[in-house]
């Protein structure tokens, strides 16, 4: 009886039992509830095919999608002090860093690279929202400063893709110090005569909005992106008033003159190339000029 219980039954159960399905195999659209297979979503640049809803795009995928043929030089992550305040809330900050690194396979929030977009050399800086909410800490601030220094040295434009909840509270004042540091870095690039374009993605809030995210020469935004300083709920509780429909969305900000264009994710590389070639006085092909004009009209409609 023992051999049946101990050997045969487990073998049968293992063959007939339910298999574990990865949690991220199917992705649900927040707007329509439609379920999309993860491979189909990745193939469509993390945009829901039917509704057009723009999901959060991983930083590595965004860099690969932006640059020609997905080829670029990754900028190294600067070394900074780890958990200098020995911060702990419900969990040790050092444990949060470890878990986020395992989850994203990144050292910190920021990924930066140098490459070409339609033949035009530029530096791109991308936030990874899945790394502690894309928050700005010492490591992220240092990486951003180094990216601006590289763009200044290379005499090329810089494009920023923020996606952040703001300053990283676990680093306290050391995090807040990154706001003026990154602002100075932006000024350094502008003084060199190079363009700085910001592509606002969902969400862009808090201290990031209060610093480098709103200092671009031109501001683009992805459809439906939430952009603001404080959250809608906090503002309503403070003012004790109901806010307008669509408040803090990319479309609302476009209507009120806070962003220049709302651009679909598939059109971002072409739009950036066209704008940067104009700003750097490089020749723009007639085909690109026509397509870019169509995008601009669609965005402002």
From Swiss-Prot:
- According to the UniProt entry, what is the EC number of this protein? 2.1.3.15
One annotated Gene Ontology cellular component of this protein: acetate CoA-transferase complex
Q: Does the keyword Ligase apply?
A: no
- Entry GO MF terms: acetyl-CoA carboxylase activity; ATP binding; carboxyl- or carbamoyltransferase activity
- Residue ranges of the CoA carboxyltransferase N-terminal domain? 25-294
**InterPro entries reported in the protein's UniProt record:** AcCoA_carboxyl_beta, Acetyl_CoA_COase_Trfase_b_su, ClpP/crotonase-like_dom_sf, COA_CT_N
Q: Which SUPFAM superfamilies match?
A: ClpP/crotonase (SSF52096)
Q: Name one GO biological process term.
A: fatty acid biosynthetic process
Q: Where in the cell is it found?
A: Cytoplasm
Alphabetically list the UniProt keywords: ATP-binding, Cytoplasm, Fatty acid biosynthesis, Fatty acid metabolism, Lipid biosynthesis, Lipid metabolism, Nucleotide-binding, Transferase
User: Which pathway does it operate in?
Assistant: Lipid metabolism; malonyl-CoA biosynthesis; malonyl-CoA from acetyl-CoA: step 1/1
Going by the record, the broad EC class of this enzyme is: transferase
The reactions it catalyses are: N(6)-carboxybiotinyl-L-lysyl-[protein] + acetyl-CoA = N(6)-biotinyl-L-lysyl-[protein] + malonyl-CoA
Q: What does this protein do?
A: Component of the acetyl coenzyme A carboxylase (ACC) complex. Biotin carboxylase (BC) catalyzes the carboxylation of biotin on its carrier protein (BCCP) and then the CO(2) group is transferred by the transcarboxylase to acetyl-CoA to form malonyl-CoA.
Quaternary organization: Acetyl-CoA carboxylase is a heterohexamer composed of biotin carboxyl carrier protein (AccB), biotin carboxylase (AccC) and two subunits each of ACCase subunit alpha (AccA) and ACCase subunit beta (AccD).
- Family listed: Belongs to the AccD/PCCB family.
Report what the protein is called: Acetyl-coenzyme A carboxylase carboxyl transferase subunit beta
Q: Which organism is it from?
A: Rhizobium johnstonii (strain DSM 114642 / LMG 32736 / 3841)
What's the name of its gene? accD
